[in-house]
UniProtKB/Swiss-Prot annotation:
HAMAP family: UPF0761 (MF_00672)
Designated name of the protein: UPF0761 membrane protein PSHAa0171
Keyword entries, A-Z: Cell inner membrane, Cell membrane, Membrane, Transmembrane, Transmembrane helix
Main location: membrane
Superkingdom: Bacteria
Annotated membrane topology: Multi-pass membrane protein
Annotated family: Belongs to the UPF0761 family.
Cellular component aspect of the GO annotation: plasma membrane
Amino acid sequence: MNDKLSYYKQQVGSFLRQQPGWWMQYINRCIDDQITVNAGYLAYVTLLSLVPLIAVGVAIFSAFPGFESTRLAIESFLFTNFVPTSSDVIKEHISSFAGNANQMTAVGIGFLAAIALLLIRNVDATLNRIWRIKKKRPMMISFAVYWMVLSLGPVFLGGSIAVTSYIVSLVSFADQGIPGFSGFLLKLLPYGISMVGFIMLYTLVPNTRVSFKAAIPGALFAAMLFELTKKGFALYISHFPSYEVIYGAVATIPILFVWIYLSWIVVLLGAELTACISPENIEDTPEIELDEQENTKDTL
């Protein structure tokens, strides 16, 4: 265990001691890919798709009455750990909208699912642009992947939260030997879940092979930046509540939009870091481009 820890420390130290030109390359990639513009577009699509996503998730859990408590646990966990402030107000409004959506017909539910799939498709397209991937997946495969994420995502999320809660309950017994150990573990839990989510996003979504060695530093960077952004945003809103004077009763909407925008910037910064340090950049060149390069060489 100590050998592995020292190995990772050496790798991180070597990574940080690299020439400044690497960081300039990273910054230039972020500028060239216009991550602030893409984050704004994804924030708009997310705000449009948020209620449909929740409505579809509620519909999936409604099909399994035994998972009602799990659905409530997921809602509580997400709003507590991933929304920096005003979570009660936001949760009340979104749950109300999703509840009204559940009263729609099958055609209406299908329309909501299409809007939710729109978000997943745009995330896929944005990450593929970051990895410079021009080759698209076949339409049927893309639809199958998107639908699997939409339908199985809430189930896997509920299962992971249930397993995590069980592990934390077991670890709480360690407080007898190490006071406050379970509380310390609970503080690390959002970091761990965020990091796992970022690793899955950076390795599974791009239409190329992304190694875990490249995804782990990017996911760790994104998870830490996400928590810092969440704390900073909550601190700003708590101490500078001028937005309530300007927007009044609808202040929750711009707050939610700004937070989603900042969250997407963090996601894209982590993706840029992962793509920049990925050792498979040459191997990951799309097959179409590789064929063109080989034909050019043969001609020369």
